[in-house]
């Protein structure tokens, strides 16, 4: 059965919770794909051989999506987190906007074809931070207010706006308040289909640049009816597993009417210099308890981010079944 529009599902079916896939980048790495590249998880798509039917890498990507779907995911993401035009044009042979558009179209069609018409597809857009690797500090230099966020996002955003295979645009892991305010200032001509913003929040429940969730909610409420009508959900991603339920609860208290999404990482800590993950923390709770708290606090899309695997998604799916 073909999916109903995502906006209709979120707005008119308040009891329905969607299961998102896990962290695609780190899961590909687990499966032996080399993502140690300035374009990170988009690296496999940049080689011509990926597009040949016999490609081994292509098989690995398909197997990953297949395993997430078997685990219960009914909304999946394109592997385009670090496929912004700047990173791609500076680091690959794709140099023009026309070639870039063909590149994104190929990734999206490949993903849609593989997941089918029944499931939802998110067009993943990583933050400006992804280009300079500071998702977990939010340190955008001395003048974050002067960065041309629109110029940075525009080529990828325009592509996802017009691509009918994309149901929902996801701005992921946003760590800086200036960037967040920029995205929230764009009207329906600039973001013309449903979108969400995933905030990158630390263990003290602050945006990585130190902004409180209260300041963020005051800003959102202050936009009143000027807010882009396509903003469908707010949420957090790549926050640590142990803190995620508390962070979501706070967000829900500040923005009670807003549908939320949450997809924490495994709780390990990323070292950007070594590009490795460290110190697996002991999980305070299991997925079942955590997912119940998510559902009780307004979560409508639940999944995993970096270092979560199909096994995590299966546990999330069975908890969602039980509690939603
Ligand atoms: C650094 S957060 C990365 C999110 C992205 N969707 C991925 O897992 O590939
Ligand atoms: Zn992540």
From Swiss-Prot:
Give me the residues that bind Zn(2+), please: 238, 305-306
Cofactor dependency? Zn(2+)
Q: Which Pfam families match?
A: S-methyl_trans (PF02574)
> Where does it localize?
Cytoplasm
Which molecular-function annotations from GO does this UniProt entry contain?
Answer: S-adenosylmethionine-homocysteine S-methyltransferase activity; S-methylmethionine-homocysteine S-methyltransferase activity; zinc ion binding
UniProt keyword list: Amino-acid biosynthesis, Cytoplasm, Metal-binding, Methionine biosynthesis, Methyltransferase, S-adenosyl-L-methionine, Transferase, Zinc
Q: What is its main location?
A: cytoplasm
Q: What is its EC number?
A: 2.1.1.10
Every Hcy-binding domain range: 6-320
Tell me the superkingdom of the source.
Answer: Eukaryota
- Catalytically driven reaction(s): S-methyl-L-methionine + L-homocysteine = 2 L-methionine + H(+)
| Protein function | Homocysteine S-methyltransferase involved in the conversion of S-adenosylmethionine (AdoMet) to methionine to control the methionine/AdoMet ratio. Also converts S-methylmethionine (SMM) to methionine.
Any further remark recorded for this protein = Present with 606 molecules/cell in log phase SD medium.
Q: What is this protein called?
A: Homocysteine S-methyltransferase 1
Instruction: List the source organism.
Output: Saccharomyces cerevisiae (strain ATCC 204508 / S288c) (Baker's yeast)
Provide the gene name from the record.
Answer: MHT1
């Amino acid at each position: 059965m073909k999916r109903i529009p995502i906006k209709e599902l979120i707005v008119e079916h308040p009891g329905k919770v969607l299961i998102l896939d896990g962290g695609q980048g780190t899961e590909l790495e687990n499966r032996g794909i080399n993502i140690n590249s300035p374009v990170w998880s988009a690296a496999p798509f940049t080689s011509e051989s990926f597009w040949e039917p016999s490609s081994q890498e292509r098989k690995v990507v398909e197997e990953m999506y297949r395993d997430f779907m078997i685990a219960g995911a009914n909304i999946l993401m394109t592997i385009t987190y670090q496929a912004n035009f700047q990173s791609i044009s500076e680091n690959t042979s794709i140099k023009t906007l026309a070639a870039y558009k063909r590149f994104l179209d190929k990734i999206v069609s490949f993903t849609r074809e593989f997941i089918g018409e029944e499931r939802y597809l998110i067009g993943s857009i990583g933050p400006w931070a992804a280009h300079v690797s500071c998702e977990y500090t939010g340190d955008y230099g001395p003048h974050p207010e002067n960065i041309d966020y629109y110029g940075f996002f525009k080529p990828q955003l325009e592509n996802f706006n017009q691509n009918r295979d994309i149901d929902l645009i996801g701005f992921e892991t946003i760590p800086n308040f200036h960037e967040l305010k920029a995205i929230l200032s764009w009207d329906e001509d600039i973001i013309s289909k449903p979108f969400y913003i995933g905030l990158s929040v630390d263990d003290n429940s602050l945006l990585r640049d130190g902004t409180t969730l209260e300041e963020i909610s005051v800003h959102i409420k202050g936009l009143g009816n000027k807010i882009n009508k396509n903003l469908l959900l707010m949420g957090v991603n790549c926050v640590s597993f142990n803190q995620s339920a508390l962070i979501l609860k706070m967000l829900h208290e500040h923005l009670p009417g807003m549908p939320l999404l949450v997809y924490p990482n495994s709780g390990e800590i990323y070292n950007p210099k070594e590009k490795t993950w460290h110190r697996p923390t002991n999980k305070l709770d299991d997925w079942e308890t955590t997912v119940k708290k998510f559902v009780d606090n307004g979560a409508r899309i639940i999944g995993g981010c970096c270092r979560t695997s199909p096994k995590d998604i299966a546990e999330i799916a069975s908890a969602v079944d039980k509690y939603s």
